[in-house]
Amino acid sequence: MKKLISAIILSILSTSANADDQQTFVFNNLQGDFTTCYSYYLLSEEGLKKSGSANDETIAGLNKSADLSLESVFMIGQQLGMNTDTMRNRVKTSFESMKKEMGEDFKNFSSVLDKYAIFCKYLIEKTDDRVLFWEDKFK
């Protein structure tokens, strides 16, 4: 999966100089998507651990998806020339925002689950489709 995301980013970078604005637009939005999903996977893992209802395999899967999302956030951020503190702050802001969405109470986690579960699954599995989505939005 890391190789796929790297290949997608490299393909965007290889476009003509006229596409700089589009590239920046796509990268900014894609990084925002991965930031959101990183927060989602972290909260999911935390909630399942607190509830005691998840097995080790589920927790490992969420952890793997969170790691991949975070690596993507930083890889894309580097391409955008963002410094590490800016990227960390963006992640922290996203995480805090998502906690507020559920009223900082895991009893309300279903609202976050409904909003992000499928989106984040597809972002991880079909990153190239999301790149195309943002490219189309730019036009």
Question: Language-model segments: what does each one mean?
Answer:
Residues 61-139:
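Compact alpha-helical subdomains of small soluble proteins
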Residues 26-81:
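Short N-proximal segments of mature Sec-exported proteins
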Residues 23, 36, 139:
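Charged interaction segments
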Residues 13, 31-32, 114:
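Processing junctions and N-termini across compartments
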Residues 18-27:
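Cleaved targeting-peptide boundary
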Residues 4-16:
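Sec-dependent N-terminal signal peptides
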